[in-house]
Design a protein with these regions (language model features):
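Bacterial N-terminal signal peptides
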Residues: 11-23
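Active-site neighborhoods and metal-handling regions in enzymes and metal-associated proteins
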Residues: 1-10, 24-459
């Protein structure tokens, strides 16, 4: 029997057993969703909010997280209407004309979708209509075209209102996110103990999926990027065989009760970092710690990212990998992505470090954000510098940089490193939710010496 067949047989048996012993999720309370709807009504100033259950985007039709946020359920072809008039009406229109699903929102009036065509023009006449623009075309088509809301006094996006609400997590949301984070941390610990030369990225991926399923969670994404794959910012997993001397860059997320975690870690396949790998790892870890230290209420949101970049560029200068830490083009060579975003109902949830708004926005208690600095050294990248940055620097400067940095860069070529934690902003500072996933070199190397039952199965 092939290795993949043995692995699948093991997972199938394990999941059947776990299905019998893991309790089902408890029914969720309607109260948080009712409170959110009331908050929207309070913000639309007598207007009418129209939130479809599904949105169209380049990847096709997707369930609206805003709709779920306000109702606690996903329903196809439904529209939630919140009227900010004196009656404060909350009406859900769907095909059945009745609620179909668990956790019935008792305060919602449910009507047939066919009623919406006649209801909406009257409800919004001379009032502000707040709509989800990404889903507006599909909603209007179902209602008979743009004439359905032509009588509104103004047509405005609902997204800013919902983003502001979703940005601050309730205690229930934080508890759910913590569970999702704990599941992901457990998956990381399992692969930390199991990973060894001769396994494949897919073998590691299978352990992660098993751990998620054990807790009735599913993967929101899984990156197991080893060796030369580790220098890719976004990756999945392949049948590539892990080799001694490789690092693996993990980027893992688990959906639990509609919320997702997001944790990145980097480990050495051999169980011990090489000196060069350790230098890069400690630099990235130092940058992350400095950024997390600054993630406190009242701090301008961009400051943690800027602090992490400063630590990285100064450290790269000490290693001989940059000649001028203040050079914009040298920054672009090494800083290849933003260092964080919000998490919640979406992996990138209504908030990102790279948003222009974050240069003025301040961090607030209840936000849950990632911090994920990374450095990547693809082989051959330095040779591309003269063509990559010819518009930013002279040919002489670029060639001199390559000549000076090239021998140093060669020592680190093929190394990728990213470290990501999920951080809750509190009233007095912050709390890292993902501490159960080891990130100190000594802890990683110690844990990689521990036995794993998966090594008896995946051979």
């Amino acid at each position: 029997m092939s290795r993949s067949s043995r692995r699948l047989r093991f997972l199938a048996h394990a999941l059947l057993i776990l299905a019998a012993i893991v309790p089902a999720w408890g029914a969720q309370s309607e109260a948080p969703h009712a409170a959110r709807r009331a908050a929207v009504i309070a913000k639309i100033d007598g207007g009418v909010a129209i939130i479809p259950s599904q949105l169209a985007n380049p990847r096709g039709i997707q369930d609206s997280k805003d709709f779920y946020y306000l109702t606690g359920a996903a329903q196809p072809e439904a529209v939630l209407v919140l009227a900010g008039d004196a009656e404060k009406r909350e009406i859900l229109f769907n095909r059945a004309g009745k609620w179909a699903g668990d956790g019935i929102p008792g305060s919602l009036e449910v009507r047939a979708m066919t009623d919406l065509r006649s209801f909406l023009p009257r409800a919004i006449r001379d009032k502000k209509a707040y709509v989800s623009f990404p889903g507006l075309d599909g909603t209007l088509e179902a209602l008979g075209g743009s004439a359905a809301i032509s009588g509104a006094a103004a047509i405005l996006p609902i997204d800013p209102i919902l983003s502001e609400l979703r940005m601050i997590k309730s205690p229930d949301e934080i508890q759910t996110l913590q569970k999702a984070v704990d599941i992901t941390a457990e998956a990381f610990v399992e692969v930390l103990k199991a990973a060894q030369p001769g396994m494949t990225e897919k073998d590691i991926d299978a352990i992660i999926q098993f751990t998620n399923q054990r807790h009735q969670a599913t993967s929101s994404f899984t990156q197991v990027a080893s060796g030369p794959n580790s220098v890719n910012i976004h990756f999945g997993s392949t049948p590539r065989v892990l080799q001694a001397g490789d690092v693996i860059v993990f980027d893992l997320g688990a959906w639990f009760e509609k919320n997702t975690s997001d944790i990145s870690r980097t480990i050495p396949v051999s169980g011990k970092f090489t000196p060069e790998q350790a230098e890069i790892y400690e630099l990235v870890l130092s940058a992350q710690k400095e950024a997390i230290r600054l993630m406190t209420p009242g701090t301008t949101a961009i400051k943690p990212q800027e602090a992490a970049e400063k630590v990285l560029l100064e450290g790269l200068g000490k290693l001989g990998l940059v000649t001028d830490p203040a050079s914009p083009w040298q920054r672009r060579l090494y800083i290849q992505h933003g260092f964080g975003h919000g998490i919640g109902l979406d992996v990138h949830d209504v908030w990102s470090w790279w948003s222009p708004k974050m240069r003025t926005e301040t961090l607030k208690p209840g936000m849950v954000l990632t911090m994920e600095p990374g450095l990547y050294f693809p082989a051959g990248r330095l040779e591309q510098v003269p063509s990559m940055f010819k518009a930013q620097a002279s040919e002489e400067e670029l060639k001199a940089f390559v000549a000076r940095v090239g021998p140093v860069y060669a020592k680190y070529a093929g190394i990728g490193c990213r470290i990501e934690d999920d951080v809750l902003i509190t009233e007095t500072g912050n709390r890292v939710l993902s501490t159960a996933a080891p990130k100190e070199i000594a802890d990683i190397e110690r844990m990689m010496k521990e036995p794993s039952p998966f090594n008896q199965i995946i051979k």
